[in-house]
Amino acid sequence: MRAQVAVVGGGPVGMLVAAELAGYGVDTVVLEERTEVSERPKATTLHARAVQSLARRGYLPGNGDALGTGAGATSGAFHFAGIHGLVITAPEGEPEPILKRPQAELERLFEQRARAAGARVLRGHRVTGIAQEPDGVRLDVEGPGGPAACRVEYLVGADGARSTVRERLGIASDTAPASVSALAGLATLEDPEALEQGWLRTPRGWIVSKRTPGGETHVRTLDCTGAYEGRERQPTPRELQGEVSRIAGRDIAMAGARWITRFSDFTRLARTFRTGRAFLVGDAAHLHFPIGGQGLSTGVLDALNLGWKLALAVRGAAGERLLDSYDLERRPAARAVVDNTRAQLALMRPGEDVDALRGLFAGLLAEDRYAGGLADMISAQGAVLPAYTERPSSWEGRFLPNFRLPAGADDLVTLLRDGRPLLLLFGEDGARHEEEARAWAPLLRVVRTGRVPGAAHEALLVRPDGHVGWSPGGSPLGGALSAYFGRGGCAPEAAVAAPGGGRGIRLS
């Protein structure tokens, strides 16, 4: 078996990587051990920056129908460490800042896009060995037909917290041991009103409950007194009922429970997200206590950061430095999530001192000048990428908000759907930069338009992931393009179906 890229792990993050790569015309194979999508309740929250980034690549349900209508900024209520009052706001023209979708639904959506773009999805296939070679990676695979070898140019490990890819490649991690015990499951309560929906804090721990459309209750418990001694022991319905009743301080009768799992605050951050021709994304790269709905969003942003870079490298339009930037950009973002989830967990522990801190934080959340920073941290809207060019301008690395072009139907979200780097030239002042970019014309999407009221620059280079790659005031445009894409002279593009149903590029 041969491919240009193998993605090991077919959860939502792995499937999104595959959809991105295949959309660029990269021969991609997904190797997934599970034979079908798991319906076990997992993550359901995507935060603003992940939602905005998916919109720019055409992945939102309805192909972007959730985008703002121009009526102004939109806001959604959230929490910090179970303290309500946090408001997350998205700019005008962007999707709603919080998207609720079951993880299984997203996995199916991304798999459908990956298959439609030409990716091979092989379920029931387990990777048993990995060897990096000078010009590629060799994988030993066990599948329904027996053992097989797979040779690829690059490897992406999206195989979760117990990543085989990470372990086989010997990538070290910074870890913190578990200090709390938690359970999750779908319970059938004998009295559906016995548990109030939402967050319940008692001196004995936490219960978070939410009723499902089918009448079951998704229950999570948190005990801050210590970690489970037998992490591998499968929890039972009786154990879940006992823990819920203990924390609630009264008997909570259950007629049954299923999909019961243990989890904790065990933390892992891989010391590098890249080694040679292999990359880590999602839980394979970073793991934290699941508070604040940030895990899935972080993995989505990993995938959208890596996809276009790896596709360009496969096609010879980018070099090692661009591939290295994946680790330089995403590892600090993952560390920030690990740190803020640890801070939130500290605020969830019992005790009078913590009670006082929670009261203080509740007051801060009521003040916009303090709450805005927390909201931007949780939603990743405050993130700015590290400088990439030699002399960065003040706009480089910032995520460019959506806007509509003058006298035209297109907006930024629409222009980025085909996955090409976008060069925006505003008015006559912007047009003077076109000649400087001519050597990269086959790679770029160049859009000449009128001046945008309030725009800070006459030209902008926007990366496929929505971040500003260059603006006047720093390095010259040619230097920025050379840093990202080499010295130009790329072969002409051939249009292919993009993940969002628009047009993508194949560099061949």
Where would I find each of the regions flagged by the language model?
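Helical substrate-recognition/capping region of FAD-dependent monooxygenase/halogenase enzymes
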Residues: 2-4, 8, 23-24, 77-87, ...
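Active-site-adjacent segment of FAD-dependent monooxygenases/related oxidoreductases
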Residues: 39-113, 212
